UniProtKB/Swiss-Prot annotation:
This is Oligoribonuclease, mitochondrial. InterPro entries: Exonuclease_RNaseT/DNA_pol3, Oligoribonuclease, RNaseH-like_sf, RNaseH_sf. The active site is at residue 194. Its cofactor is Mn(2+); Mg(2+). It comes from Bos taurus (Bovine). PANTHER family: OLIGORIBONUCLEASE, MITOCHONDRIAL (PTHR11046:SF0).
Length: 237
């Protein structure tokens, strides 16, 4: 066992006293905790292109994923995957899907792809596991409830990694249209490319607009009035 003075000298020789080591450990532990909390606030943005909206017969043909922090800054871009589907399914798509997926080049890309649904889920799951902790980060997107139905059915392992709640930009859009019609007129309009990665990027920009123009930071004056109103209500009650 080292003597007290010798032990202290050795500790100082490798970088500090016992107290300094404890302080450094606290700082590093706090930084790790903050990083973990930050990762838990991330959003998993997903957009799918399908052969239609019938969950019983239609299939996913394209998918893309972006990860943002809670302030909507893009942190990572995931795989943008084209999934092989049989020609019979593509030929049975609605006229709308045939027109738009044909114009965008997606139909041709699907026919040329060799990616299976199982491979796509594996790549997506590998990506989100690197970027987010399990069970904490929500699925986000525009009308993302429709995407979620297909993900629940065809990519259950991917969905198990996410939180059960969703962040649907279309909900904010509809509330803004009703409550703040003047601001709504300036909301970014979708380019309607009907390609997965483009649609996600547009959804993030749209939510950024609502955040900056609808979810406004309270000024000190507003905070004061809210506090006063709260105190008045307590007095009356």
């Amino acid at each position: 066992m080292l003597g007290g003075s010798l032990g202290s000298r050795l500790l100082r020789g490798v970088g500090g006293t016992r107290g300094q080591f404890r302080a450094r450990g606290v700082r590093e532990g706090g930084a790790a905790m903050a990083a973990g909390e930050s990762m838990a606030q991330r959003m998993v943005w997903v957009d799918l292109e399908m052969t239609g909206l019938d969950i019983e017969k239609d299939q996913i043909i394209e998918m893309a994923c972006l990860i943002t922090d809670s302030d909507l800054n893009i942190l990572a871009e995931g795989p943008n995957l084209i999934i092989k589907q049989p020609d019979e399914l593509l030929d049975s798509m609605s006229d709308w899907c045939k027109e738009h997926h044909g114009k965008s080049g997606l139909t041709k890309a699907v026919k040329e792809s060799t990616m299976t649904l199982q491979q796509a889920e594996y790549e997506f799951l590998s990506f989100v596991r690197q970027q987010t902790p399990p069970g904490l980060c929500p699925l986000a997107g525009n009308s993302v409830h429709a995407d979620k139905k297909f993900l629940d059915k065809y990519m259950p392992q991917f969905m198990k990694h996410l939180h059960y709640r969703i962040i649907d930009v279309s909900t904010v859009k509809e509330l803004c249209r009703r409550w703040y019609p003047e601001e709504y007129e300036f909301a970014p309009k979708k380019a309607a490319s009907h390609r997965a990665l483009d649609d996600i990027s547009e959804s993030i920009k749209e939510l950024q607009f609502y955040r900056n123009n609808i979810f406004k930071k309270k000024t000190d004056e507003k905070k004061r009035k809210i506090i006063e109103n709260g105190e008045n209500e307590k007095t009356v009650s």
